[in-house]
Amino acid sequence: MAAGSGSGSNPKDYQDPPPAPLVDTGELGKWSLYRAAIAEFTATLLLVCISVSTVIGEKRQSGEGGAGVLGIAWAFGGLIFVLVYCTAGISGGHMNPAVTFAMVLARRVSLPRAALYTMAQCVGAVCGAGLARAMHGGGQYARHGGGANELAAGYSAGAGVVAEMVGTFVLVYTVFSATDPKRKARDSHVPVLAPLPIGLAVLVVHLATIPITGTGINPARSLGPALVLGLGTTKAWSHLWIFWVGPFAGAAAAMIYHHYILRGAAAKAFASSSYRSPHF
Amino acid sequence: MEGKEEDVRLGANRYSERQPIGTAAQGAGDDKDYKEPPPAPLFEPGELKSWSFYRAGIAEFVATFLFLYITILTVMGVSKSSSKCATVGIQGIAWSFGGMIFALVYCTAGISGGHINPAVTFGLFLARKLSLTRAIFYIVMQCLGAICGAGVVKGFQQGLYMGNGGGANVVASGYTKGDGLGAEIVGTFILVYTVFSATDAKRNARDSHVPILAPLPIGFAVFLVHLATIPITGTGINPARSLGAAIIYNKDHAWNDHWIFWVGPFVGAALAAIYHQVIIRAIPFKSRS
């Protein structure tokens, strides 16, 4: 859109960062790693607390002046937008183990960092759900399902996994597009708008799959309320595997799509990969 | 480049109105601050051998697949419930279409142009922004993607899908086919006009908000058109979206109205292309050097 008139033979106008090492011992001694983990913890806590609170509030008022299902979808999408905006520069603004997983597969973050992020996200989600429970009271919280993800009646577990998978694909695909150095260099709208399409991707996925699974697409978000509701016995607990398997599979698929089809390996096989599409 | 700031500030054309139409641009050709790309050839054999051509097709397929999957699933979620208050409602459907177009145009604009819509491809082809082969390839990939997307939604719950209209576009009772056609034409005009404005070389050079925001007004145009015309036709403005749902739903009353959702968008896209190229930009009147 912005660039695009250059011929393919000139030097590249962008630089791909080198792949992150699997284990980077140097970063373990740095404050910035721990600061990033704390930022992930806080952001996930806020995300889960506010969004679960919206879900419980809507169910308590059921239809009379509540935020409505559209309001729930906006709570998730809007919070992701705001929190990615705030934390992108500190930790990358993942707030989602599936996104972190995709980033490991793409070699953008090292393994210890990813493990630390995932832990921080899960702990943050549990604390956030606990905070929401405290706000609404244990009885009300449990009566309205605790904002946990579970499969709606009439849908098979397979449908739930596919719904989670495609939903996470949309999200992670958007994240990859927003953080791609090549796209950033070519289209001026990519770096400027970045958090907005990520938030709106979350919004539209919620609009689509709230009736099926309540929409996880974030294993930490599903884990938090399920743990706070109680171990072992609840429906949310027995369905929890769907909200880990689906998102991770979707994230891996998005990474493969972006990395191999849109960016990398397959293109190199063609000699004339320099042809540019007419930019829109 | 003198007067550019003034031009940007006013958002107006910098040539004085006393100059006759068309000649102004020729006279000032040497100090233009933008470059109009040459028209795409009808058939370009070179691009058939490039990976980026097929990658763009795959990107269109995946984008249309995701678009149909998310939006039809939202429509299903709304229409299966007896009370609209317990669902995301019509506004949620409109957000689903508009938000998805925004996110997908953002993601695929740099790969394929991010059309996701045969009407947009057709409009841009009329303006000679892509070759005929590419346009046909895109449209085929968009339609295939749309069919797959609607198919996955049907796979989730077949009875529910068939019992609730399958998200197919039909003209609502109380409206004539002419009403539906008019709604589709105007709706697509708004969308394609926005696309042309967002991709215009001159506007991109003059107004900094044009290239930076590009996907956002396109998504909003789709959102607003859906708010307006969901009660009339369910809002197509995208022949691939209408075709995908119609093929998977496959009932007579959906097929009877189906031509509207091809004729309407294509006419609207053609009008927008003519409006933008001839009236706004006067490109046919300019000599190309």
UniProtKB/Swiss-Prot annotation, chain A:
It comes from the Eukaryota. The chain crosses the membrane at residues 36-56, 70-92, 113-135, 156-176, 192-212, 236-256. Its main location: membrane. The keyword Transferase does not apply. GO terms for cellular component: plasma membrane. The gene is PIP2-8. Keywords: Cell membrane, Membrane, Repeat, Transmembrane, Transmembrane helix, Transport. Aquaporins facilitate the transport of water and small neutral solutes across cell membranes. PROSITE patterns: MIP. NCBIfam families: MIP. InterPro entries: Aquaporin-like, Aquaporin_transptr, MIP, MIP_CS. This is Probable aquaporin PIP2-8. The lineage of its organism: Eukaryota, Viridiplantae, Streptophyta, Embryophyta, Tracheophyta. Aquaporins contain two tandem repeats each containing three membrane-spanning domains and a pore-forming loop with the signature motif Asn-Pro-Ala (NPA). The keyword Hydrolase does not apply. It is found in: Cell membrane. It holds the Pfam family MIP. Belongs to the MIP/aquaporin (TC 1.A.8) family. PIP (TC 1.A.8.11) subfamily. It is a multi-pass membrane protein. Residues 1-21 are annotated as: Disordered. A motif (NPA 1) lies at residues 96-98. Expressed in leaves and at lower levels in roots. A motif (NPA 2) lies at residues 218-220.
Curated annotation (Swiss-Prot), chain B:
It comes from Oryza sativa subsp. japonica. It is a multi-pass membrane protein. It comes from the Eukaryota. One of its GO terms (biological process) is response to water deprivation. Recovery of PIP1.1 expression after chilling is increased by pretreatment with mannitol. This is Aquaporin PIP1-1. SUPFAM superfamilies: Aquaporin-like. Its main location: membrane.
